[in-house]
Design a protein with these regions (language model features):
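Conserved ABC ATPase "signature" region
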Residues: 101, 105, 112-130
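Conserved catalytic motifs of ABC-family nucleotide-binding domains
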Residues: 155
């Protein structure tokens, strides 16, 4: 394995009966990256995270985490991994401190190190004033922060987050984004799944579009957008049926936009990650994570 990569996956396949939840997936994630799987509910995001983080088995392929085969060397691989699942597994009847300490015990941390590590992480994340709060009394955003401390208590190199901001309001979501940026800037490799295009575009160095257990496209948000054209003309007439055209240059986009009369509303803008996702997959994702009705075929140059 190339030591530059903390995740190296080849031919990963997971079957549920005749259904391929993961379908021959190949991927690599570099150390220190913030990497996103972007796709709708049912695309295979959660199943992939569970397989990569040793929470479920798989039928074909290989997974290397931090240089260790997760089948042949599961304990070594697990030591490098922290996981936060979409549905947080905290004990709501315990305090913040009790939850964090129970995770330290689960990770078999030496007694002398537990309090020091929890205090360090809590100060870093801003949880020090909440030790005596019952978890059930915290907001969704603060519960996520407790879960992050629990996931990092054994000092892993890689953090998996499955749909980390689902159910959070916009303020809590952006607060969590800031925290993830801070962790990443300090060297943590982060692999997250999301159906929020803005989240992937704002946070991540590289993004994969995933659909039916396969990676459709992969690259930086900018590179993915540029694959369909650097500039987008968005236009609609009296029927309010929005269409799109993509161009490599602003001049081409401007020239195209001049053909429309005053009955049309026309916008020329830079192409974004959402444009690329819709163009490459033929679908849009709703706020609830489910596919919306396929848009009408776009027109373009």
């Amino acid at each position: 394995m190339d030591d530059d990569y903390i995740i190296d996956v080849k031919g990963l396949t997971k079957l549920y009966g005749d259904k391929r939840a993961i379908d021959g997936l190949d991927m690599k994630v570099r150390r220190g990256e913030m990497y996103a799987f972007l796709g709708p509910n049912g695309a295979g995001k959660t199943t992939t995270v569970r397989a990569l983080s040793t929470l479920t088995g798989f039928d074909e392929g290989s997974v290397m985490i931090d240089g260790y085969d997760i089948v042949k060397n599961p304990m070594e691989a697990k030591a490098a991994i922290g996981v936060i699942q979409q549905h947080i597994s905290l004990d709501k009847d315990l305090t913040v401190w009790e939850n964090m300490m129970s995770h330290a015990l689960y990770q078999q941390m030496p007694k002398a190190d537990r309090k020091k590590r929890i205090d360090q992480l809590s100060e870093y994340i801003g949880l020090g004033d909440y030790y005596n709060y019952k978890v059930d009394n915290l907001s969704g955003g603060w519960k996520k922060r407790v879960a992050i401390v629990c996931a990092l208590v054994h000092n892993p190199k890689l953090l998996f987050l499955d749909e980390p901001t689902v159910g959070l309001d916009i303020q809590a979501r952006r607060g969590l984004w800031d925290l993830l940026r801070k962790l990443n800037n300090d060297g943590m490799t982060i692999f997250l799944t999301t159906h929020y295009i803005e989240e992937a575009e704002s946070l991540c160095n590289r993004v994969s579009f995933i659909e039916k257990g396969k990676i459709i496209a992969e690259g930086t948000p900018e590179d993915l957008a540029h694959k369909i054209g650097r500039f987008t003309v968005e236009y609609y007439g009296l029927d309010r049926n929005t269409k799109y055209a993509y161009f490599e240059s602003r001049q081409e986009a401007d020239d195209f936009s001049k053909q429309f009369d005053d009955t049309y509303t026309v916008t020329v803008r830079r192409t974004n990650l959402e444009d690329a996702f819709v163009e490459m997959t033929g679908n849009r994702i709703g706020d609830n994570g489910f596919m919306l009705k396929k848009p009408e075929k776009k027109e373009g140059a």
